[in-house]
Every structure is written in C-alpha cells, then in structure tokens.
Amino acid sequence: MRRMGAGFVGILSAELHFPENGSLKGKRKELLSVKAQLQRRFGASVAEVDHHELWQRARLTLSCVSRGYREVEELMDGAERYLAGQAFELGRIERNVVTLDD
C-alpha cells in the first residue's frame, strides 16, 4: 500500500506585552484584531493560551499546515514579522515544525 504524504504542522507561540493597555476589554479588542489578521494573512489557527486574567500580557499560539517544510517555515516567518511590527511589545517566541513521520 502506498503511504500518503503527511505534510507539516508549524507551531508558533509568542508572549505579547501591552504596556499602554489599561483593561481586559482593551486587551481583548487588540487580540481580536491580531488574531483575525493572522488568520487572514497566513491561514493560521490562533488561540490565546495563557495570561487570560492579565490586562497587559497575553500568550498567543498559532498553527499552520502545509505539504512542505519550507512553506510552513515561510508562513511562521511571516507571522513573526507581522507580530514584531505591531504596537505591542513582542517577548519570547517559541517555534516548532512537526510531521506525522516524527
């Protein structure tokens, strides 16, 4: 039986700091915009995964899928550049690419 190509999944997790923000409502508003842009521009699935109760911090994790390793790396590079260009401060970033063959 012929084996199907598994494809690659990229995972990027980023710490965000909103020094000018003064409320959870303000943070949520900014995060909604950022998440929508990441989804639209890079086809990424995005979730806030930590610091829900803090109004100046957030951790976003996104994932993207492609049939090629290079394509996944390019998508994550683009997402990281997008995040770095925003008004908030970008902290620690973790990245990984996995495949079902791993």
Give the ranges of each region predicted by the language model:
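A structural signal for short, well-ordered beta-strand segments
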Residues: 12-16, 60-62, 93-97
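A short linear hydrophobic-aromatic micro-motif
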Residues: 44-50, 92-94
